[in-house]
Amino acid sequence: MSRLAKKPIPYPENVKVNYVEKEHKIVVEGPKGKLELNVHPDIKVTVNQQERWIKLDRPTDRSFHKAIHGTMAALVKNMIKGVTEGFTEVLEIHGLGYRAQLKGNVLELHLGKSHPDIYPIPPDVKIEVKGNEIHIHGIDKQRVGQVAAEIRSFRKPDPYKGKGIRYKGEQLKLKPGKAVGKK
């Protein structure tokens, strides 16, 4: 990752990037919103407003600095992508009678329990329900993934029948049931 981090990270014209040196904070603002990132104090940040790029530099080639350098570069790239395009995660609901519905700013999940599971939707994330799919949209990749994981945790896929909530495209390896032997 650290080789990719050595290159300057370009950003489009509709994105504004600022670095607040006192607070070690990068602020990225774009058409979809604004994101902030606290940068590790060892990482030096250079923002070129004219040529529209941001560069991160590490003080040494120690493995810790290489790791944190690559991580910070990946986070900045995700911030730029988030404020321009946004991120989407899709969950699928499998199971007879399993369904989801939106009620205001709350997601109500009926997952075969005696009561519906209620998930309050965070203000920085947008959720849509289309049939048996839940679409989660947002500008912060980490937040979108966290919300998807929290919703999935209400009913993870069953290893025998595959019932539950899963990510779109997630492959399940179903276990065989109990084998009835001869007597």
Swiss-Prot record:
Highest taxon of the lineage: Bacteria
Gene3D superfamilies per UniProt: Ribosomal protein L6, alpha-beta domain
Keyword terms, alphabetized: Ribonucleoprotein, Ribosomal protein, RNA-binding, rRNA-binding
Quaternary assembly: Part of the 50S ribosomal subunit.
A GO term for molecular function: structural constituent of ribosome
UniProt function note: This protein binds to the 23S rRNA, and is important in its secondary structure. It is located near the subunit interface in the base of the L7/L12 stalk, and near the tRNA binding site of the peptidyltransferase center.
GO CC annotations on file: cytosolic large ribosomal subunit
Name by which UniProt lists this protein: Large ribosomal subunit protein uL6
PANTHER family, alphabetized: 60S/50S RIBOSOMAL PROTEIN L6/L9, LARGE RIBOSOMAL SUBUNIT PROTEIN UL6M
Similarity comment text for this entry: Belongs to the universal ribosomal protein uL6 family.
Gene Ontology biological-process entries: cytoplasmic translation
